[in-house]
């Protein structure tokens, strides 16, 4: 019987708007027992590349190269890519570009909206486009505080789609790492990809401790454009 692994597939570093460095993220993920992580900084893969290099030299943790792409229609996470995906394209073109690299396209927090205007407009999730385009998976557990309703909507959407369900912390601070996670058969990136492609993943979530919520609030006050309006 294959031992189950645990992955966090949505994380940010100082390469975009996260507080932890790639090295800190790797060390912390290792310390809490994760087997695979995907570093998915906004519109860059530099953090992921640095994290992967550090993990290979210093730990047994596996790092999937990822990117949270700011498409014209909302954020899309690319997994298993080798080159940066250009932001600003339509969601359809973004998914196509990800697949062109042999990557997997994930509809993350598909129903999250914000009232604050950002570089990519006011839409942060692709919404019902998750059902219309060829996404490989849907993020149904996101550990951002206040996302309960958004997660429930994503779960209901995915029940109809039958796509692989993923959990990703959307961590911007170390306290968030692993708070939402994906369980899969195996403990390697290859096994994880197989699980996503065959729909054998299970998404889960853990509650924050009080101090973690306080730190997240502090991060939010410094990054108002990324705070969800609930």
Task: Label every PLM stretch briefly.
Residues 39-42, 107, 140, 168:
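Conserved beta-strand positions
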Residues 1-15, 19-27, 32, 46-49, ...:
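Charged catalytic cores and adjacent phosphate/nucleic-acid-binding surfaces used
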Residues 60, 101-106, 110-111:
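Short beta-strand/loop segments at the ligand-binding rim of alpha/beta enzyme cores
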Residues 35:
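Short acidic/polar active-site loop segments enriched in Thr and Asp
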